[in-house]
């Protein structure tokens, strides 16, 4: 690994020199190419330089401990060494992740779809909890979340919520979240205090640009209707809601969140493009899966991937066997430990 990182750092320094070369600057196309390549290596080089600095500090601390006769000072040095070792391990894990082969979709924004599954009203409330968890995670990452469409229940749950998450590397962090999420808790409506199990499904789709997916307008059937609100009551009398059916695949997208029919159509097309691209990629993944099974599961949307147990304050990811006893912080968007583990295991598959 060190050899590879040394080679990357050398390449980074070469690019740095080229970017400052007046001859290269004069050739704008070449200069832009080098700037882009330089930027792509910046993160891994910064982490590697931090890693080398920590390794040097560890070596210096060990040398100091060997020569230090004072026991109190040796104990202080040992505490510092423990701290540095933990820092080194964390940086090593980050480097392993940064060295993983890039997924062509990693830098894309995502369409996040959450649907209440088995469990009625409790499942809808859990779908709302999951949406909040991902929204809080997005905030922590400096990303932007926008609800594209939502089907609310009377007590604040979601039968379905579709959102767009935009930012740097969103898909790279979110791609392993697709699947069935299960919750075990005592519902607020349950007088007997019994634990109920319900579920919600999550689908994470890379946002597709028009160049990624070609859609023939003749393949679309577009219906317009009056949008309805909570409990089915009419929100407005104009036909602003849109339903688009992609005839060849049978994929249907309905959108009624906006008051403008044009905006609803635009959002529906965004979701349709993402679903069509996802369909193509799922078919491709299934072909690969027949020869290589991923260590983080099949990626099948019907696969149960995670359990959230409220009485035990526990969350378990079944694909990597990771259990954390801090469900409260996970639901508040503290997902990095789970996501990092999934990325590392997924990259080694």
Curated annotation (Swiss-Prot):
Single GO MF descriptor: translation release factor activity, codon specific
Modification after translation (UniProt): Methylated by PrmC. Methylation increases the termination efficiency of RF1.
Pfam family membership, one: PCRF
Lineage top rank: taxon: Bacteria
InterPro entries registered for this protein in UniProt: PCRF, Pep_chain_release_fac_I, Pep_chain_release_fac_I_sf, Prokaryotic/Mito_RF, RF-1
Predominant localisation class: cytoplasm
Keyword annotations: Cytoplasm, Methylation, Protein biosynthesis
Signal peptide as annotated in the record: none
Transcription keyword on record: no
A Gene Ontology term for the protein's cellular component: cytoplasm
Compartments where found: Cytoplasm
UniProt modified residues of type N5-methylglutamine: 233
Function, as annotated: Peptide chain release factor 1 directs the termination of translation in response to the peptide chain termination codons UAG and UAA.
Family: Belongs to the prokaryotic/mitochondrial release factor family.
Protein name listed in UniProt: Peptide chain release factor 1
Organism of derivation: Pelotomaculum thermopropionicum (strain DSM 13744 / JCM 10971 / SI)
